[in-house]
């Protein structure tokens, strides 16, 4: 067994002294995953994957099953917590140049895609009005694929429309994907500890390290406590804060909701999809909104790893963050002026971040004579 693994077993994993709170979100994601697995199992025990019974089974869980309401709310709001943590975790990776650790970054991006797929399948399961129409809109994007599109859509649906087979396979996928997430998370952590964590300065940490326990373990526990308090506060006092009113009506294929929109954590991607008035173009932009993350290790031209000493890149990063929020906001609005224009400009700026990344690096190298 390699030397580092032995150290890890004893909690003596060496960690940079100067890593900030932004490095705590990895352990928080692990806690979220554990919570989702436990609550998900107890919900699956009582859930019925049938289009006539799914909606009623959710009502049965919340009303009749002991602490079922708590399991259901913890699972739904836990998913939101999961995405809050993963978006902060990715933003930290972007800001501090963690993407230069290629294997870890690629496994992390794959984890994000798997998480998004799992969340989408889970959103369909209650078979509410918004679940049904969100599934219809998103799965319909497959038809935009030339030649294979229609065949793939029919294969995914299990028929010529979204029906009982669709719900059954979505439940099966929602159940099995988290096991893939667990496996890939283990690989992600293993690959990270091959090289070790970065630090805010983006320098080599070898000269100044401390043991993981007790320093980082207590820091992790503090952040986990804060997250638990937030989660339980929302579950207890504002359980429907992330819900859509249409989710409380049973799916009706004959009535289209006024405004179809996904959960808040998919709004940025949905906004990018909607900003392009072409089905295939929108589907490609949607895919690229995530896939662009994979280009970052190859487009990093700066001699400095972290953005801590790169003012131009900091401005670009915070513009990107604001753009992300603006796209999410416009995606909640109807498709009419001025929202269409705002969303198109924001989508363009979103992709410009990835294009400007190498240019900014080169420019900063010139200015600082590196």
Swiss-Prot record:
Signal peptide boundaries: none
Binding positions for heme b b562 per the UniProt entry: 75, 174
Keyword annotations of the record: Electron transport, Heme, Iron, Membrane, Metal-binding, Mitochondrion, Mitochondrion inner membrane, Respiratory chain, Transmembrane, Transmembrane helix, Transport, Ubiquinone
Domain of life, per lineage: Eukaryota
PROSITE patterns xref list: CYTB_CTER (PS51003), CYTB_NTER (PS51002)
Membrane-spanning parts: 25-45, 69-90, 105-125, 170-190, 218-238, 280-300, 312-332, 339-358
Subcellular location: Mitochondrion inner membrane
Binding site for heme b b566: 89, 188
GO (cellular component) term, any one: mitochondrial inner membrane
Miscellaneous comment in the UniProt entry for this protein: Heme 1 (or BL or b562) is low-potential and absorbs at about 562 nm, and heme 2 (or BH or b566) is high-potential and absorbs at about 566 nm.
Subunit structure: The cytochrome bc1 complex contains 3 respiratory subunits (MT-CYB, CYC1 and UQCRFS1), 2 core proteins (UQCRC1 and UQCRC2) and probably 6 low-molecular weight proteins.
Family: Belongs to the cytochrome b family.
PANTHER family named among the record's database cross-references: CYTOCHROME B
Name of the protein described by the UniProt record: Cytochrome b
Source organism: Chilabothrus strigilatus mccraniei
Lineage: Eukaryota, Metazoa, Chordata, Craniata, Vertebrata
Gene: MT-CYB
